[in-house]
Design a protein with these regions (language model features):
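A short beta-sheet element
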Residues: 29-30, 48-110
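Feature representing long, continuous alpha-helical segments
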Residues: 60, 103-107, 116, 133, ...
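Non-catalytic DNA-recognition/assembly elements of restriction-modification systems
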Residues: 1-11, 141-171
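Cytochrome P450 core scaffold surrounding the K-helix E-X-X-R motif
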Residues: 37-42
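Low-complexity, Lys/Gly-biased intrinsically disordered segments
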Residues: 1-36, 52-54, 123, 127
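Short glycine-enriched, charge-decorated loop/helix-capping segments at active-site entrances
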Residues: 43-47
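A short glycine-rich beta-alpha junction/loop motif
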Residues: 84-92, 100-103, 123-145
Length: 171
């Protein structure tokens, strides 16, 4: 998916001076990209004006957002809300074309098969990370849309069953 990936602004394009206490544009940070999905913590914002300067890093609801580090490769879907969102420099986004289900890609990216590709090619020692260029090269099987939807439905069904089993064991 080479032409569908975008990285966050270079660090110097989103500095502390660009942050605001006004709840204008939510900055998606590593702490928001959880193993189990979106984490609504560590809220930071920038201005609508600054968003216009880094507009290619804007994230829309349903876009796939991938952490570049700690651990590299985990992914979430941007939440559906009235807020505007922008990537931090530690994340990338995939804007998917028609015919590709964002939940299917999310599950594929969060799979051990994809993560192994990421971990085999990370760089750094203390801050292990990947890059958009590397993420663009990893393989994800993309079946026809009907099969993608069927896979997503089955995965959701199985996770629901696991949640019910977990709750019954805690009771």
């Amino acid at each position: 998916m080479p032409k569908y990936g975008y990285d966050g602004p270079f660090g110097s394009n989103l500095k502390k001076e660009h942050y605001t206490s006004e709840k204008e544009v939510r900055i998606i940070q590593l702490s928001n990209i959880g193993e189990d999905g979106w984490r609504d913590e560590n809220t930071k914002f920038t201005t609508f004006e600054h968003l216009s300067a880094i507009s290619r890093s804007e994230v829309k609801p349903g876009d796939v957002v991938i952490a570049k580090m700690m651990p590299a490769g985990r992914a979430i879907l941007c939440p559906n809300s009235d807020l505007k969102y922008v990537l931090s420099s530690d994340a990338v986004k995939f804007v998917l074309p028609d015919g590709i289900c964002n939940e299917y890609i999310l599950n594929a990216i969060n799979s051990s098969v994809f993560r192994e590709q990421v971990y085999d090619n990370v760089q750094g020692v203390t801050r292990v990370r990947t890059s958009l260029q590397k993420l663009r090269t990893y393989l994800v099987p993309i079946p026809p849309i009907k099969e993608q939807l069927r896979i997503v439905s089955k995965v959701n069904e199985l996770f629901s069953q696991l949640d019910m089993i977990e709750k019954s064991l805690q009771a």
